[in-house]
Design a protein with these regions (language model features):
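Electron-transfer interface patches adjacent to heme c in soluble/periplasmic c-type cytochromes
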Residues: 1-110
Length: 110
């Protein structure tokens, strides 16, 4: 099972599509206008080559990479309610409580 886990976590991300399409360009402009980029960070840099570990296994090919995930991969405390809408679903997933949401990566959407 560890091999499957390693494989799944090492898969490449989908390529961005239709980057010159006017509708995609408008969507990107709206993304910044709505300040989505404050949580959905466009560009991140991985740790130096040779320092990326997964379950104690070095993954040198994942180091020194520039990625465009449109996420910060963090858990955010969304509170129990925002503007009168209850966001706490009481669903525990891993270490995340029901009021914590991970910023979903938007890579490959275009």
């Amino acid at each position: 099972m560890e091999d499957v886990d390693l494989y799944m976590q090492s898969l490449g991300v989908p390529a961005r599509r239709n980057v010159n399409d006017p509708q995609v360009i408008r969507g990107e402009q709206n993304f910044y206008k709505a300040k989505c980029h404050l949580c959905h960070v466009t560009t991140l840099h991985t740790k130096p080559r040779g320092s990326v570990l997964l379950n104690g296994t070095r993954l040198p090919w994942l180091g020194s990479q520039t990625i465009h995930p449109y996420s910060d991969f963090l858990l955010h405390d969304m509170g129990s309610e925002i503007m009168g809408v209850g966001l706490n679903d009481n669903y525990v997933s891993g270490l995340a409580r029901g009021n914590e949401w991970r910023t979903t990566p938007l890579w490959g959407i275009g």
